[in-house]
């Protein structure tokens, strides 16, 4: 590249060469700074990876020519570009649909990395300029979490046949692909244009480095997910380049997040089971929504409805680099999906918001996506929904519901050419008549099958070869060695009674395994096992659990909204108390029935006439001191003591280091500069909880580092000052002064990471930044923040101020959140936009 080329060759240049090249480079900086090329002031131009490329030019000149008068302005301008680019291109969390934020506008397969790679390189250059970390925003922490949670179950590597075929037909796309025998490693599914199933590039690790003094847990998880020696985006295997300097430093393997099933706004759902074991599997169900999107694929309105399945170290579905990318093919041609025959073509489910709940109830999991309705409908009214019901870590039931049973459909499944398909047992929608046909297809990249049928489709899919399934009117029966399952899945409610097993609803599971009975009610009004019956009027209340001889019945529930359940108790449990998260719940008792009000959200329940099992406690923070740290945890109900465990090998083995009745524990006597992990177990007289999430502790006797990301949001008479988080901090101290010669005064001290400083004379930001000289009068306030822990106070952070002309303080739309539409007229009614302008809070 030209930055590293100039940097490397400058010493050998003649004076004339240096003058001419310097003039050319500075001209490039001037051209790329203003709004004539990829504007930022009058509009936020895109796509975001283009903006990252273009706006990287001026800060590159800051690195090459640090004494240039415009060098500070170019650095500040780039920082603001990062802030705006991430603010308006990162899908937010949507609490009403229990969806997390972080999905980037551009596709996972290629273009999120096309944004990150040049941005991270620019950030590296600017850190050489003045040491300030600029690649920061709350949204970047969310992006890191999304990139981590989008990873598959551990993958052992491509099959020899599949890998040889890849090298032969898709040369140039193989960067990041895991060669045979090189696993296990987690990979991203091949989603969008130019995609492959790849290990995350080293950019993710470096993003973690950027976030360490801002969003440290997101940083830890990113460094766990990617390694500094991973192949970079589009880099050749074992290639050497100047940017390798970015990835040198002490070994740090981050912190294991112990991935769980997750839903992400505008992306889809990832279901997981048996995480961190050899039985781990993951199912990735994709559905993007209307709004800023780039290169997610032409087929299926961006791959909507496509499914990816990883289990037992293998990939059991695959999409070629452009098959749901830039190729002009139809929705169901070369991917794992489902389509209804509509207007002369098979249509997948199409774009829509993720409005249906996702359930992770232990024995079973369930998720569902639906098509959009209205004038812009794509698959309605013919297509109703696509759902996945996951039973343990053994198999899943894929159900596609259509409007009536005469609609022609196509279920498709594809793997990499040379790989094997999973076990697919079609139990509904494939009756053997003329509409039921199977077509085998092979392209240079993929091999797969079309299953054409009519009406609803129910398929039992598994990586296991010893699975047997039988279709029924209520769904299916599934047999595995050692277990018998009854799966309830039907668009219309079914009523089932067999011995002491009861079910009423549309989606559920009952599993018998020896002396254990597990159950899950996803959508319905009633489920009963062994005389224990749960009844509800809320058909979206999800409730699962297990009955094991000699143990109290227990499980999980998820209530999208506050709800109620009626529990019929056999004599054995007639004196039992209903506990939620270890706390006894008020209940109305009627004979052998308890009526309990359930709070919104995901919770653990237990029916017990003794003490319940406490839930796993979470470490809130640590407070460092020489040789260790205090560990502050969130107290949990029913716990009388807490046990602190420590690991020195990244969580492989654990040893007890403290046990106390209070939710503050200590780990001491540790070696200087070592990194350890901590976790806590809650105890009472009868039970111990599962271990809580692990938390990193960096042992030091030195004062801490200051936080990164000190920024100011201006308004008339007030400045909202915010900063990042430091692991091990006891509290933060914010200092301010007015005028360059005045002493700094402490204006805030505490654990919060933002403070509203109200003072007369503070001005709102200018409408256009950088158009007047820096304010120097006494009304301008300068800030810095420090960190305090048991070892003392840190040095000062990089400063911030209230200069209304500064690029760093400029905000074109104060307070505006992620916008789903590109533009709208001021004052126009919301319904004038093509779709909702904003997600609900």
Residue ranges and their predicted role:
Residues 667-687, 757, 761-794:
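Beta-strand-rich modules
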Residues 576, 642-644, 732-734:
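Short beta-strand elements bearing conserved aromatic residues within extracellular beta-rich modules
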Residues 449-460, 591-612:
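C-terminal beta-strand-rich structural cap/linker in extracellular carbohydrate-active enzymes
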Residues 107, 114-580:
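Extended polysaccharide-engagement surfaces of secreted carbohydrate-active enzymes
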Residues 612-637, 672, 687-728, 777, ...:
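Pro/Thr/Ser/Gly-rich low-complexity, intrinsically disordered linker/stalk tracts
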Residues 586-588, 656-661, 746-751:
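Short beta-strand segments within Ig-like beta-sandwich modules, predominantly Fibronectin type-III
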